[in-house]
A protein has these predicted regions:
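Short, structured active-site-proximal loop/turn typified by the sulfatase FGly-forming signature C/S-X-P-X-R
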Residues: 42-91, 148-152
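Bacterial Sec-dependent N-terminal signal peptides
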Residues: 1-25
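Conserved small/polar residues in nucleotide/adenosyl-binding loops
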Residues: 479-485
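Structural recognition of the beta-strand scaffold that forms the well-ordered cores
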Residues: 30-33, 64-66, 82-84, 148-153, ...
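Mature N-terminal segment immediately following signal peptide/propeptide cleavage
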Residues: 23-42
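Second-shell loop/turn segments in exported
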Residues: 38-44, 69, 121-126, 245-250, ...
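Secreted, luminal/periplasmic, and some membrane-associated catalytic domains
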Residues: 49, 75, 97-124, 132, ...
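His/Asp/Glu-rich, glycine-adjacent segments
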Residues: 87-88, 93-274, 283-290, 407-413, ...
């Protein structure tokens, strides 16, 4: 990830030096992060695209292929925090959307902060758990606070980590009301966003929204689909989840564009010679987080609509600011939602792994070895947290207990490797440990990290979604676009 962002800085400097003797800063930097964008799909579906979206980026921009996040356990929160901070979870602290708070033994959200109230939401959130500065913060410092920073995203974590600590505002969609939301952390909610909520928000329009394929069925041939009928969704059919379904559809990208256009029309962003930042997040995942097997046609249509959303965004930027005054970068979050387990019919290796059962058996093993006590305090997201106070009371060596626990966990079916915190922090370097170490934060991660074999399903018996482990990664195409002044 550091290499990716270093490339961005090099391009900015090199482009400016070639153009003139003194580097000209852009009026507006637009960061477009596309959640769950897959490079293989992006290229496979290219015959369905127009000339003004992805193809324009490819022709007129500069593309960096095969970029890879250098840490494990990527999700939306950790990816966007890495993009905008330029460093890994081991430094920025955002190891995932949720992690276990060792002091309370309860999962916490990466954005939770009860010190701040919400606008158009009952969420109390802020970017305070992000431990490093971001592009937005550094822009504010460089411009002595004069550069404007707005972040617009379907989801709260994406907006907050893109806006950083010093941004002017972060906006995300309330999944219960469809209104654009914000936090008092950034001060007053902008008047133009309130006006949009009161007059044009999707709650006024969603009843009439229907999603059908743009093209005839015969054009969606890139993924196997066994259905004979075209899909048709009315978001309003499921009244209790209509906004959640909308947020997990390609229509949300047009809503992001709509609020971005409001900012360009009614604020001063991009209007003077002081560089501003507009950080946007799109969605390119499966509809309503279904598997590809369930919605092959939908995912192809999603990329068609995504291409058109990008074309619309470029047109708005050209009209309002002039693309010659804009630097745009486009990248992906580098992960995808978990897919369905492989069918046993095809004899693909796999099975089910239960972290809660694994933690219970580990506690029994430690009791048999060291005497009565609750040695395992908690477990979460393939990590196990040990009871440090009990170990201190019994005068047991933490590193030794971690190592013995890791060796015990290695005996479980489905476990590829178990890493102790001591090994991750102080052990010798290997390519595997390097990526896990980069995703590990000593104050937020567990004592033990379990690497489950590919093809196995991590079953959550306490509620929540199950997860199928895949060890392949989706390369992150990074695109930079600047257009020369005519």
């Amino acid at each position: 990830m550091k290499g990716l962002l270093t490339s961005l800085i090099t391009v900015l400097t090199f482009t400016g030096l070639q153009a003139q003797s003194l580097p000209a800063a852009p009026k507006l930097v637009v960061g477009l992060t596309i959640d769950q964008l897959r490079t293989d799909y992006l290229e496979a579906f290219s015959s369905l695209y127009g000339e003004k979206g992805f193809k324009r980026l490819w022709k007129e921009g500069r593309v960096f292929h095969n970029a890879e996040y250098t840490f494990c356990g990527i999700d939306r929160a950790s990816a966007i925090a890495a993009i905008y901070s330029g460093t890994t979870p081991s430094m920025n602290g955002i190891i995932s959307q949720r992690w276990m708070d060792a002091s309370t033994l309860r999962p916490v959200n990466s954005t939770d902060d009860t010190a701040f109230m919400g606008y158009y939401t009952d969420q109390t959130v802020a970017p305070t758990k992000l431990l490093t500065s971001t592009i937005a913060d550094e822009l504010k410092i460089a411009t002595q606070g004069k550069g404007l920073v707005y972040a617009i995203a379907p989801d709260c974590d994406a907006a907050l980590f893109a806006a950083g600590h010093a941004g002017n505002a972060a906006f995300w969609l309330n999944p219960n009301t469809g209104k654009w939301s914000g936090t008092t952390y950034y001060g007053e909610f902008p008047w133009w966003a309130s006006q949009y909520n009161d007059r044009q928000a999707i709650d006024f329009r969603i009843a009439g929204m229907t999603w059908e394929p743009i093209f005839p069925r015969g054009m969606y041939t890139f993924l196997p689909d066994w259905r004979d009928m075209l899909f048709k969704y009315k978001f309003d059919d499921d009244r209790s989840n209509k906004y959640r379904r909308f947020i997990a559809s390609p229509f949300v990208n047009d809503e992001v564009n709509a609020l971005a256009e409001e900012a360009l029309n009614k604020s001063s962003i991009g209007m003077d010679d002081i560089t501003d930042l507009l950080a946007l997040t799109y969605y390119a995942g499966n509809y309503a987080h279904k598997s590809v097997q369930e919605c092959a046609m939908e995912i192809q249509d999603t990329y068609v609509r995504l291409d058109r959303s990008i074309a619309d965004l470029l047109e708005v930027l050209d009209k309002k600011v002039g693309l010659q005054n804009v630097l745009i970068f486009v990248t992906s979050t580098g992960y995808i939602d978990s897919e369905s387990p492989d069918s046993g019919l095809y004899k693909v290796p796999g099975g089910e792994f239960y972290l809660n059962r694994c933690a219970a058996l580990l506690n029994m093993y430690l009791m048999a070895t060291y005497g009565e006590g609750k040695y395992v305090e908690a477990h979460h997201n393939q990590q196990i947290y040990l009871n440090h106070k009990l170990l201190e009371k019994k005068e047991l060596n933490l590193a030794e207990i971690q190592q013995k626990s890791a060796e015990f966990l290695m005996q479980f079916s489905g476990v590829n490797e178990a890493y102790s915190a001591n090994r991750l922090l102080l052990g010798s370097w290997t390519p595997e440990i390097y990526k896990i170490r980069n995703g590990y934060h000593r104050k937020r991660s567990g004592d033990l990290v379990i690497d489950v074999l590919p093809g196995w399903t991590i079953v959550n018996e306490n509620g929540g979604d199950n997860k199928v482990v895949r060890h392949s990664y989706i390369p992150v195409s990074y695109t930079h676009l600047t257009l020369p002044t005519n």
